[in-house]
Structures are given as C-alpha cells and as structure tokens.
UniProtKB/Swiss-Prot annotation:
It is a lipid-anchor. Gene3D superfamilies: Outer membrane efflux proteins (OEP). PANTHER family: MULTIDRUG RESISTANCE OUTER MEMBRANE PROTEIN MDTP-RELATED (PTHR30203:SF20), OUTER MEMBRANE CATION EFFLUX PROTEIN (PTHR30203). Involved in the resistance (detoxification) of the fungal toxin fusaric acid. One of its GO terms (cellular component) is plasma membrane. Residues 421-430, 494-530 have a biased composition (Low complexity). InterPro entries: OMF (IPR050737), OMP_efflux (IPR003423), RND_efflux_OM_lipoprot_NodT (IPR010131). This is Fusaric acid resistance protein FusA. GO terms for molecular function: efflux transmembrane transporter activity.
C-alpha cells in the first residue's frame, strides 16, 4: 500500500496539473472555415473525357519536340542566365535556411557565459558591511547552461513542418517560373519563325507587283497602255515595302527579346539564325486526369504546399495555448577573491538543475487572434488563379482550333498554288496583255498571296498552342512520391488531401529525410520530395 505521504503527493500533482490546464487561455470558437476538395470529386468535363488519352505526360525537355537545335540552345541559355533565376534560387536557399532555423528549436541548446569583472564593493547598510566592504576584487564567473524544450503539444514539430512546407512551396514556385520562362522563349521563337515566313511572302508579293508595274510601263512605252495603269500598278509598291520593313523589325525585336530572356545584351540576338521548327507530336491528354495533374503542375503543387504550411500554422497556434515546459541545467564557477583564476577552483563551482514552466493565463486575446488568423489563412485554393494560369487553362483548346485552320490553309495552297499558278504563264502566252486581263492576273495573284499569308499565322498558332498545352500539363515536372497533405499528423486539414495523394500513387516518407531532399531541390531550383 502507498503511504499517506505518497498519496498526498500524487493528489497534489494531479491538482497542480488540473489547475495549470484550467488556468491556460481559452481558444474560443476558432475553427477552419473551409475544407479541401478531393480532386477525383471534380468533373473533368466532356472535352477532357473525349480527348485522346494516349499522348502521355510531357517530358522535362518538351521543347525538343520542335526539333530545332538552336531553340534548345537558347532555352538552356535562358535557364542559366535569366535575370530572375538567381533571385529564385536565393529565395529557395532562404526558405531552406528558415527550415533549418525551425528545426533547431527541437534540439537541446547549450550556451556558455564568461564574465571577468573588476568590482569595487560598497560599504553601506543595504549592500554591506561584510568581508568585501570597501574593497576592490575580481568578480569572475563562468557558466555552461543546458536547455531543452519538452515539445509535449507538438508546437516545435509543427513549426518545423510548416517551414519545410514553405520551402517546398518556394521551390515549386521557382520551378513554375522556370516553366514560364521556357514557354516565353518558345513563344518568342515561334513568333520569329512566323515573321520569317511572312517576310518571304512579302518579298514574293513585292517582286510580283514590281514585275506587273514593269509590264505596265512597257505597255505604256509600246503605246498599248495608259499612265493610269502604271500608276495603279505602282501604287501598292510602297505598302509592300512597309510590310517588309515591319516584318524585319519584328524579327529583330524577337532577337532582342530572346537575348533579354537569356540575360544577355541585344547584340547576342544578332547570331540567331532563321528558325527551323518542325512539330509532329499529336495534341492529346494523358490517361489520368485530373488527379495526377495535381502532382505535375508546379503552380498547383506550390499552392498545395502553401495550404499544407497554413494547416501546420493552425497546429502551432493551438499549441501556444498550453504550458511550456523547459528542462534547465547550469554548471559553473564563481570567484570574488584573489587570485584572478579563483573561479576555476573546484571548491568555487556550483550547479542548478530542474524544470521551468510557463503558461498563458491572460494575454488580452492575442493567442485567440493568432489562431483566428491561422484558421482564416487556410483557403481551399491556396491562392487566387493568376492570369498566367488562366492562359494555361485555356491553352489546351487551341490545338483543336489551329489544326482546322492549318488544314484549310494547306488545301487553299494546293488549290490556288497547284492549279492556278501554273496556268498564269499559259494564260499570258495565249492572250494579249489587255488591261482587263492585267487586272484579272493581279486579282488571281492577290488571291494566291492571301491564301499563303493565312498559313504562317495558323501554323504559328499551332506551335504556340503546343507549348501552352505542355505548360498546362506541368512541363514534365517530377515532384517525387511525397505530396502535400500526405502526413496524417495534420489532423482535419490533411484528411481531405489523403485521397488525391492516394489517387496519384503518393507514399509518405520519413520526416527526418526531408531536410536533405529539400536542400537538393533548392540546388536544382525544383520542388523535391518531402
């Protein structure tokens, strides 16, 4: 049987714990105002369901489908020397450092203090008298302190997880910016290719119109034509010259744009040759939509990591309502008499050890306000959809719209170019060049030029739409097997994320392995597995 003293001690301990817990500040009615929606619960829509499902996910170097080595070179240059690339890598390193700072709070802390002071001791009623009254001595102390915070409520652990989630979100944001840079380079390069094609048509049209003007002048010299015919034939030449100048200016502007995206001067773009783009890849969608897309779109991954970090912030805010218990220990030496090293003698040593407890009782509503802010910060989407995201979301519709245009332009080219253009010389040989026939010839030439002029924009639109589709599918980002929300310790906020993680085949990994993986991710500028 327990002695009465032991029973009394246990009763006092239970009473003390009860009073401590009751004395803590109240959380009030603070709870998250939103819940996460499962990806598989969303309707993908008839367009996605009817799309080709054999295309597969894009590769990390998806732009190589254009089969242009010069494009590959400039994308690599943009990735290495973009002006904001260093800033993105710096933000990733900063987030990694903050994660290490949060991690250090979970470990024991050892601090040393050394004080070497020459002191004059007073001689009065309050501070003296005594053996040291009105004397000058050394007051030297040296201590070594150990402190360890007992994380009974998971505050330090959740703070570390929040910092790691923030680091993952920063790395995913950096990868999203890198993908956007790749798309911008491809878009500028495709625009240059289109302007080169339009420039060829403008030169061809100008030469054709100049030959018609020469023919009109010869007719005038032979007495078969009029000055009006010459003026009509020459009136469009300045317009064609201005078109040539505008296309050449657009090409030069694209060169400067590519040089700027690569972080180089305008002169670097002068070495860019004419693009040789060729795209045979079909426009289709992967077989697992939309659940797998959550783990492949870097902007979506960043938003999910952000929501995950906000959920950890709720746990940190809740833990602030409970008592803090620290284990403290100090050992040191103290000396106030001669010699100078008197404090190092064993007889002058001392130590302290024991727990230290602090608890919030009245804090003016500060903790409840912090918890309310943490709950309000958790939003289903994590952040608003940006204009770039809307463009990517609309990009998958463009290939289907560009293909008919390209097909119609190709049919028009074969019809007008294959049938009418060979007949023009025969018509010119059989019929005398009368004014009405000159006008008919000019009309046929204009129809041919119009059909050809529509083809480059349609082809360019298809090439750009392919880049937008690759970006909308994530650009070949590999985020690893661990995804946001795969840790069950999130409680209510993680329950809704478990289904998307399971749908994409995600498996949680040990938290101890995360810092090294985050560091590797930051070095590469891409989100890594947690």
């Amino acid at each position: 049987m327990q002695s009465p003293a032991t029973k009394g001690t246990l009763a006092l301990a239970v009473l003390a714990v009860s009073l401590i817990m009751a004395g803590c500040a109240s959380m009030g009615d603070n709870k998250p105002q939103s819940a996460r929606i499962e990806a598989n619960a969303l309707d993908a829509g008839a367009a996605i369901r009817a799309a080709d499902r054999d295309a597969g996910w894009p590769a990390a170097d998806w732009w190589r489908a254009y089969r242009d080595p010069q494009l590959d070179t400039w994308i690599a240059a943009a990735q290495a020397g973009x002006p904001d690339a260093r800033g993105r890598r710096g933000r990733v390193r900063e987030a990694q450092a903050m994660a290490r700072v949060a991690r250090s709070a979970e470990l024991p802390q050892i601090n040393g203090n050394l004080s070497l002071m020459r002191q004059h001791w007073p001689d009065n009623v309050y501070y003296g008298p005594g053996p040291l009254a009105n004397t000058d001595t050394w007051n030297n102390t040296g201590t070594l302190g150990l402190s360890y915070h007992l994380d009974l409520w998971g505050k330090d652990k959740n703070a570390t997880e929040r910092a790691l989630d923030t680091a993952h979100a920063t790395a995913a944001d950096a990868r999203a910016a890198k993908l956007e840079l790749e798309v911008n380079v491809v878009r500028a390069y495709v625009g240059m290719s289109m302007n080169y094609a339009l420039l060829d048509l403008a030169h061809e049209t100008f030469e054709r119109q100049r030959s018609l003007a020469d023919l009109a002048r010869k007719r005038l010299q032979a007495g078969l034509g009029t000055q009006l015919e010459v003026s009509q034939a020459e009136s469009t030449l300045p317009d064609y010259e201005r078109q040539i100048d505008s296309y050449e200016e657009a090409i030069q502007l694209a060169r400067h744009q590519l040089a700027a995206l690569a972080g180089k001067g305008p002169g670097a773009g002068d070495a860019i040759k004419r693009p040789r783009l060729s795209l045979d890849a079909p426009a289709g969608l992967p077989s697992a939509m939309p659940a797998d897309l959550l783990g492949r779109r870097p902007d979506v991954v960043a938003a999910r990591w952000t929501v995950d970090a906000q959920a950890r912030g709720i746990d940190v805010a809740k833990a602030s309502f409970y008592p803090n218990i620290d284990l403290l220990a100090t050992v040191g030496g103290f000396g106030v008499t001669a010699p100078f090293t008197d404090f190092l003698r064993a007889m002058n040593g001392g130590w302290t050890a024991g727990p230290a407890l602090s608890l919030p009782i009245f804090e003016g509503g500060r903790l409840r306000a912090q918890l309310g802010a943490a709950n309000a910060g958790v939003r289903p989407g994590g952040r608003a959809i940006q204009p770039d995201d809307r463009r990517r979301a609309q990009g998958h519709r463009r290939p289907g719209r560009a293909d008919p245009f390209a097909r119609y332009a190709e049919e028009g080219r074969r019809t007008l170019g294959g049938r009418q253009r060979p007949q023009l010389p025969a018509v010119a040989r059989r019929l005398p060049p009368r004014p009405d026939r000159l006008r008919q010839r000019a009309g046929r030439a204009a129809a041919i030029v119009g059909a050809h002029r529509k083809r480059p924009p349609h082809r360019s639109e298809r090439l750009a739409a392919h880049a937008q589709l690759m970006a909308a599918l994530g650009g070949g980002v590999e985020t690893g097997t661990d995804v946001p929300g795969s840790q069950s310790s999130h409680g209510e906020s993680a329950a809704g994320a478990a289904a998307p993680a399971a749908a994409s085949g995600a498996k949680p990994v040990a938290a101890a392995a995360r810092p090294a993986q985050v560091a590797a991710a930051g070095a590469a500028g891409v989100p890594a597995a947690r």
